[in-house]
Amino acid sequence: MCNTNMSVSTDGAVSTSQIPASEQETLVRPKPLLLKLLKSVGAQKDTYTMKEVIFYLGQYIMTKRLYDEKQQHIVYCSNDLLGDLFGVPSFSVKEHRKIYTMIYRNLVVVSQQEPSDSGTSVSENRCHLEGGSNQKDLVQELQEEKPSSSDMVSRPSTSSRRRAVSETEENSDELPGERQRKRHKSDNISLSFDESLALCVIREICCERSSSSESTGTPSNPDLDAGVSEHSGDWLDQDSVSDQFSVEFEVESLDSEDYSLSEEGQELSDEDDEVYRVTVYQAGESDTDSFEEDPEISLADYWKCTSCNEMNPPLPPHCNRCWALRENWLPEDKGKDKGNMSEKAKLGDSMQEDEGFDVPDCKKSTVSDSRESCVEENDDKITQASLSQESEDYSQPSTSNSIIYSSQEDVKEFEREETQDKEESMESSFPLNAIEPCVICQGRPKNGCIVHGKTGHLMACFTCAKKLKKRNKPCPVCRQPIQMIVLTYFP
């Protein structure tokens, strides 16, 4: 088996390409502080392989529970011997180069002058990890490992690298039995590892080794990778999965069917372009207004219901609890005036029914006819009176003139009274909202009733209401779908 060199730079930084996987079989001697740490978790030797060092470090981290519970690849060692050893308060198992650097600072490679010590350490290592191998295998293994231990000295020259390649080719010609026995021993090493943080450390290191060996052509150790991946279990998978997550969402594009900038423009371009001034009213939850937030209304303005003793705001005429009508809601004078107005309205309606209307212009043709007939009768009377006066006596012109003037004044007074009565009757029959202009255009009167179901809202002109219906817009007041638009006439 090839054991290439391990070169350590002056500043302690070691690249992953300089540390092939075969160096895990290289024997190293930990420094006193690291040796103390390893012996605290059961190590009993002076020389170890890289596998054993990493294994005991993982056991130490697991024993002291220095890892994070949620992110188990993070190790906190600020107040521990490991922090004094590495010189950092915390580190991550995924930072392979940093781990190599910190470990190699505390290791000394076994020199070529100590073959016996290295041989005994190898035998102790095998006995410790295998536990069930016989003495014959150990003797054969010592014979195999002794010549390879002479290659552990740092050889940065090109000739040493060529020698390592030649040794690799020689070892590739070994017998299948010996190769199988060595593979069996490496499997035993993997099986002896507990499913702890040591596995996580070795797995991360092996992943880095495999990626670096593929890029630089450095030989890797597939036996260690197979052993670790075989016994890693779900404990490592959950840790790796927890660090990875994905969020799926769809970005709205301007070309999608649901969103288009020209959609509203196409709807508005069905007719001529017009500019609208819209007044928006926000409908409340109930028909009555809320007076609780009005600063101008105090508790002294509230009235008490005589039926249920409920305190009610001043404006509603009924009680909010029992719906009893408020006493003395309107003064008596206004009530009488209202009765007189209603009587006048009834008289006006009866007169209008007798006379009739010209729909849709609402012109009163019969009224003008009656006026003309009255004027003609008065003219006939005047002419008759004048003729009689002329035939009787030409000496009384003043009396005839006074009669003419008096008849003309009577006609004017009659017309004034008639127009006043009609105006009063029309004002009493008009709804209050009809006087206000259209809410949308603020120019035309409110004559387009928006009908939905058995109710309707009169808040817009007929033209604006038709546009709302054509564009499938809801009622601006109650947001119900519009069924029809009714042109409303006021007398």
Curated annotation (Swiss-Prot):
Region (ARF-binding) location: 210-304
UniProt PTM comment: Phosphorylation on Ser-166 by SGK1 activates ubiquitination of p53/TP53. Phosphorylated at multiple sites near the RING domain by ATM upon DNA damage; this promotes its ubiquitination and degradation, preventing p53/TP53 degradation.
Protein name, per record: E3 ubiquitin-protein ligase Mdm2
Record field: compositional bias (Basic and acidic residues): 333-347, 360-374, 409-425
UniProt domain SWIB/MDM2: residue ranges: 26-109
UniProt-listed Enzyme Commission number(s): 2.3.2.27
Superkingdom of origin organism: Eukaryota
Region (Sufficient to promote the mitochondrial pathway of apoptosis) location: 1-101
Gene3D superfamilies listed in its UniProt record: SWIB/MDM2 domain, Zinc/RING finger domain, C3HC4 (zinc finger), Zn-finger domain of Sec23/24
Free-text comment about domains: Region I is sufficient for binding p53 and inhibiting its G1 arrest and apoptosis functions. It also binds p73 and E2F1. Region II contains most of a central acidic region required for interaction with ribosomal protein L5 and a putative C4-type zinc finger. The RING finger domain which coordinates two molecules of zinc interacts specifically with RNA whether or not zinc is present and mediates the heterooligomerization with MDM4. It is also essential for its ubiquitin ligase E3 activity toward p53 and itself.
Localization terms from the record: Nucleus, Nucleoplasm; Cytoplasm; Nucleus, Nucleolus; Nucleus
Zinc finger (RanBP2-type) boundaries: 299-328
